């Protein structure tokens, strides 16, 4: 989730004063810094970074900036683009703006704008969307096109992967869960996450750790770190898990994973 976004608005001194007054009325004004430069104003929005699969835990700087720009008397194309983009993805993280909000027993869809830029007269917007295991890429693409095409928008790039999902009752998950529960005392069921892990590259694999319940999620953050105590606790759990998997009596011709 981007923690910074900026825009330069070409304007004269009279227009600069008007924009400064409008910023004072914006509810997120404390997150936007306005600087006078030759030929106009530079706006820098500051948010709070978060993992792409957890947009609700961050403050998206792009959404803050779009929220301000949509109410400005900009050139027609820019004003309309800011308004439409904010309507589609600036107000929520669950896809309601694009009408793709959905959820199943393993989790809900998340969505966040991660890039927006004006170049060669074209405004590009990049979205990060993580969808539930009960949906697929074809469903997602069809629903997005249904919404954006009547607005005059085009889908110029599409890059995605189907969910990687292993059933909670599979032998692999149950073996790992048993080890974790014995070592931690935490009896909660396993969970599915929106993050893409290296497990996706291995057919018979799942992500296992390393964050314990209640701990702050520091991956991909400016202060990413892990304590020695946590590493030692993890090592104990991982060693027990490897031992359990290596000594499991797996059926001769049966995959340890039931997809």
Provide a role label for each language-model segment.
Residues 41-43, 121-125:
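Hydrophobic residues embedded in beta-strands of well-ordered beta-sheets
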Residues 3-6, 126, 138:
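Extended amphipathic alpha-helical segments enriched in small hydrophobics
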Residues 46-49, 53-112, 117-120, 130-135, ...:
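An extended, acidic, His-containing surface patch that forms the Zn2+-binding/catalytic region
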């Amino acid at each position: 989730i981007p923690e910074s976004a900026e825009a330069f608005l070409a304007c004269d001194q009279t227009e600069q004063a008007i924009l400064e007054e409008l910023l004072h009325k914006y509810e997120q004004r404390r997150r936007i810094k306005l600087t006078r430069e030759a030929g106009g104003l530079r706006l820098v929005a500051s948010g709070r970074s978060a993992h792409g699969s957890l947009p609700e835990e961050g403050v998206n700087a792009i959404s803050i900036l779009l929220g301000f720009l949509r109410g400005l008397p900009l050139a027609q194309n820019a004003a309309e683009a800011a308004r439409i983009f904010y309507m589609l993805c600036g107000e929520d993280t669950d896809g309601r703006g694009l009408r793709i909000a959905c959820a199943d027993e393993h989790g809900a869809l998340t969505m966040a704008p991660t890039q927006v830029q004006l170049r060669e007269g074209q405004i590009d917007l990049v979205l990060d969307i993580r969808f539930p295991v009960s949906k697929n890429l074809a469903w997602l693409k069809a629903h997005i096109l249904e919404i954006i095409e009547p607005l005059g928008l085009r889908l110029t790039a599409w890059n995605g992967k189907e969910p990687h999902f292993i059933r909670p009752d599979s032998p692999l998950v149950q073996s790992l869960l048993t080890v974790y529960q014995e070592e931690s005392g935490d009896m909660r069921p396993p969970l599915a996450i929106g993050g893409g892990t290296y497990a996706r590259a291995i057919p018979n694999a799942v992500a296992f750790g390393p964050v314990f319940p209640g701990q702050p999620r520091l991956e991909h953050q400016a202060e990413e770190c892990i304590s020695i105590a946590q590493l030692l606790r993890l090592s104990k759990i991982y060693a027990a898990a490897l031992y359990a998997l290596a000594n499991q009596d797996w059926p001769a011709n049966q995959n340890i994973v039931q997809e």
